[in-house]
Amino acid sequence: MGKKRFFDDRLKYLSFIQNTGEKKAISEKIYPYISRLSQNKSYLRILDAGTGDGTINANIIKSFHRYHPYTSLLITGKEISYEDLKNTLEKMPDRFVEHPNLLVTMTNVKFSELGLIESASKVNNKKIREFNLILKSDNSYDFNSQITGNKLGDFIKKYWGIEIDNKGRTSYSNPCIVRIYREDNSRHLKQFLLSLIHI
């Protein structure tokens, strides 16, 4: 095993992030950039890597809707941790109500592999595991039931695992991608979905 870092210990890491103003400070640094984006954009892509517990991700969506309520937001989160993935997804139901024109993508691959995850069938000689959750209804209660439901939950439990090599380095057991969007807003996202979904 390599040298142990404080964020390798889950309890120490959670204690740190829950008792500092780091996420609030980072979010507040981002808001001015979002407010100054051109109003003429039809869409915006944002990469949040790693998402951690999803706080900054959720704050970005809130801020984006404040200034660009009708613009398509394609936000990709990169996170290898099973727990952080769940925490991030649990923050999304309200965001889909607030900003319907939203495509949330979550993946666990490395930075160098992000360009492959949407266009290839394999990454690092491993089959890409995909799950597309198309949200039905129009309220956060129903969205929460679907996002935290068994179908997506079973996919995550089965495929979103971690492997550790003999040097203590972590990697995914399967390259995964999860996409979530509202069915009643798919017409606005169609141009992006046609090029992404290949299952």
Language-model features: where?
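Generic structural signal for well-ordered secondary structure
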Residues: 23, 53-54
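Conserved strand-to-helix beginnings and helix N-cap segments that scaffold or border functional pockets
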Residues: 27, 57-58
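Class I S-adenosyl-L-methionine-dependent methyltransferase module
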Residues: 39, 53, 59-195
